[in-house]
From Swiss-Prot:
Pathway: Lipid metabolism; fatty acid biosynthesis
GO cellular component: cytosol
Gene that specifies this protein: fabD
Organism field: Staphylococcus aureus (strain MRSA252)
GO molecular function, one term: [acyl-carrier-protein] S-malonyltransferase activity
Biological process, per Gene Ontology: fatty acid biosynthetic process
Keyword Magnesium among UniProt keywords: no
Active-site residues, Swiss-Prot/TrEMBL: S89, H199
A Pfam match: Acyl_transf_1
Catalytic activity: holo-[ACP] + malonyl-CoA = malonyl-[ACP] + CoA
Name the UniProt record assigns to this protein: Malonyl CoA-acyl carrier protein transacylase
InterPro entries: Ac_transferase_dom_sf, Acyl_transferase_dom, Acyl_Trfase/lysoPLipase, Mal-CoA-ACP_Trans/PKS_FabD, Malonyl_CoA-ACP_transAc, Malonyl_CoA-ACP_transAc_FabD, Malonyl_transacylase_ACP-bd
Record key words, sorted: Acyltransferase, Fatty acid biosynthesis, Fatty acid metabolism, Lipid biosynthesis, Lipid metabolism, Transferase
Record EC number: 2.3.1.39
Family in the record: Belongs to the FabD family.
Lineage: Bacteria, Bacillati, Bacillota, Bacilli, Bacillales
Length: 308
């Protein structure tokens, strides 16, 4: 029996003009976009549509923008009926909305706070991330341990697909790895345009503040399993999910294991909802046999709704 998972991208997928095609052209999507504008303490629609102030790339704005775009697309889609959901890093919050663990309004407040805490904890230039291409996890882990010291660390942060591991930590060590990457055996080491050492143990400094903030919202058991970044398996219990969302701040994203877990459950169709096709590209490198669908635009929504 064929099974479907809906999946959601994380930071890096944002672009100016995102979701503008949905606004005023689809009632369900417009409702989500308007709700975001009414819930947040900044003009999110201006930031998403025109970004005249150049603030879309700041993590406290990027995070609610991506959640809003994915949630608007999700609201516009008919007859989805997924068996599972999964998101990459920030995208996991879109999966929580999809599975009704959090209301959209609560989720958008949470990711705004998550971004603010991340930005405050690490002023620009302290921490960073880079993608290591052409090495397996064990080798990357070994390199990270050899570069780290008592006062500076670098760690695997996103285990994305075979031959692509993202590392995170102090910028000085990220820069060193970028410089030495080829001599250490990597095909390439590419610095990422992010403002902090996300998914590394350095993020533990915000654990307490974030945990106490998210406790004030209503969390519900998931309507269908959410495959979590931290443990790469489906969860439905609200307390387990909430605890894992705190751990997610400072733990690696287990994307390969999560995808393989879903395939083991019988999933043969992944539907990526949100800007870009990054996750579809990763999944193709994990398993070439599964079906991949990308829903990014109003046209994609219309195509799905007409055909399904």
């Amino acid at each position: 029996m064929s099974k479907t998972a809906i999946i959601f991208p994380g930071q890096g997928a944002q672009k100016v003009g995102m979701a503008q095609d949905l606004y005023n052209n689809n009632d369900q999507a417009t409702e989500i976009l308007t709700s975001a504008a009414n819930t947040l303490d900044f003009d999110i629609l201006e930031t998403m549509f025109t970004d005249e102030e150049g603030k879309l790339g700041e993590t406290e704005n990027t995070q609610p923008a991506l959640l809003t775009h994915s949630s608007a697309l999700l609201a516009a889609l008919k007859n989805l009926n997924p068996d599972f959901t999964m998101g990459h890093s920030l995208g996991e919050y879109s999966s929580l909305v999809a599975a009704d663990v959090l209301s959209f309004e609560d989720a958008v407040k949470i990711v705004r706070k998550r971004g603010q805490l991340m930005a405050q904890a690490f002023p620009s230039g302290v921490g960073s991330m880079a993608a290591v291409l052409g090495l397996d996890f064990d080798k990357v882990d070994e390199i990270c341990k050899s570069l780290s010291s008592d006062d500076k660390i670098i760690e695997p942060a996103n285990i994305n697909c075979p031959g692509q591991i993202v590392v995170s930590g102090h910028k000085a060590l990220i820069d060193e790895l970028v410089e030495k990457g080829k001599s250490l055996g990597a095909k390439r080491v590419m610095p990422l345009a992010v403002s902090g050492p996300f998914h590394s143990s350095l993020m533990k400094v915000i654990e307490e503040d974030f945990s106490s903030y998210i406790n004030q919202f209503e969390w519900r058991d998931a309507k269908f399993p959410v495959v979590q970044n931290v443990n790469a398996q489906g969860e439905t219990d609200k307390e387990v999910i909430k605890s894992n969302m705190v751990k997610q701040l400072y733990s690696p994203v287990q994307f390969i294991n999560s995808t393989e877990w879903l395939i083991d459950q019988g999933v043969d169709h992944f539907i990526e909802i949100g800007p870009g096709k990054v996750l579809s590209g990763l999944i193709k490198k994990i398993n070439r046999d599964v079906k991949l669908t990308s829903i990014q635009t109003l046209e994609d929504v219309k195509g799905w709704n007409e055909n399904d």
